């Protein structure tokens, strides 16, 4: 018996195989059966590559409820919403059950799942996944029994809950029968390769990748199937922020525009301050400053001041790559900004109007008003507490009278 350490660990290699498949084929709807602690789902939400619906199914609701919040959006998902939508759902259910919501998926993954079924249940598994669900592709991974003698200290199956472990021939026999009965083609591969002359035993984990043969049949749910009762129990559902949501898109666009405009405003203020106090700065620094300003003026419209307003040309803001990616055209950008009350623009819509001075006085007034309001709230709460104490004393006195 030979020691066979795997680096990275075998489970990570299995997940990476699925991630690589998703990167290559970009399925929009993915469902993972036997998702347990949601490890694969967590990885796929970071490597979504076009995934719009990510679903996990497991019979163990306790584990799902414990792990489901690890799939929630991060702060960064709100600060930088993705271009495409993403919904994640977790269900308590069995791969042996015909559930209407599992139809119409592009990819089904069954990572180290099938060996936990009884042998007589495998046919039902095949019928539900390949016959009823009929996804575009299915990835099935399972232990290779021929590799077991190379695993140190192993007696019997690799896990106490495994009902069987197939040799390569047994796995391939099952897979080819599935293809004949349900119209799929299959390719075999694996992860966890033995070293040296032991390679003839195959991979430690064997993998079958099924692709449905195109037959022109629409596999989406029919109207009758929409009426079928659901047998799964929805435990968790979250919709990630994305630019497909008009409100999120508008907020993101305005934030980017204002950030860029404030940046240009600040640059202009610094430059003006240095011009007004040129005797404090070295000639090389001033020369560099004027050279940069002239270059910008030649290439783009300059920022300018009108009274107490600094005008930042919209064309300057439009030159920001992030703004261009969000808006597509300068005209569309102008239209979006004119719709938003947070943005002040020139009469002809050619520039954003920003205050020349930081409005410190208004900030102080707002802080004073907030402090006064807080003090009033404290007084109100104190009065309520005093009244409660009086009522409590009165109530105690009434009990004493009895």
UniProtKB/Swiss-Prot annotation:
Its cofactor is Mg(2+). Keywords: Cytoplasm, Differentiation, Magnesium, Metal-binding, Methyltransferase, Oogenesis, RNA-binding, RNA-mediated gene silencing, S-adenosyl-L-methionine, Transferase. Residues 348-402 are annotated as: Disordered. It is found in: Cytoplasm. S-adenosyl-L-methionine binds at residues 58, 94. Gene3D superfamilies: Vaccinia Virus protein VP39. InterPro entries: Hen1, SAM-dependent_MTases_sf. Mg(2+) binds at residues 112, 115-116, 162. Belongs to the methyltransferase superfamily. HEN1 family. Binds 1 Mg(2+) ion per subunit. Disruption phenotype: Defects in germ cell development due to reduced piRNAs levels. SUPFAM superfamilies: S-adenosyl-L-methionine-dependent methyltransferases. Methyltransferase that adds a 2'-O-methyl group at the 3'-end of piRNAs, a class of 24 to 30 nucleotide RNAs that are generated by a Dicer-independent mechanism and are primarily derived from transposons and other repeated sequence elements. This probably protects the 3'-end of piRNAs from uridylation and adenylation activities and subsequent degradation. Stabilization of piRNAs is essential for oocyte development. Residues 356-374 have a biased composition (Acidic residues). This is Small RNA 2'-O-methyltransferase. One of its GO terms (molecular function) is metal ion binding. Gonad-specific. Its main location: cytoplasm.
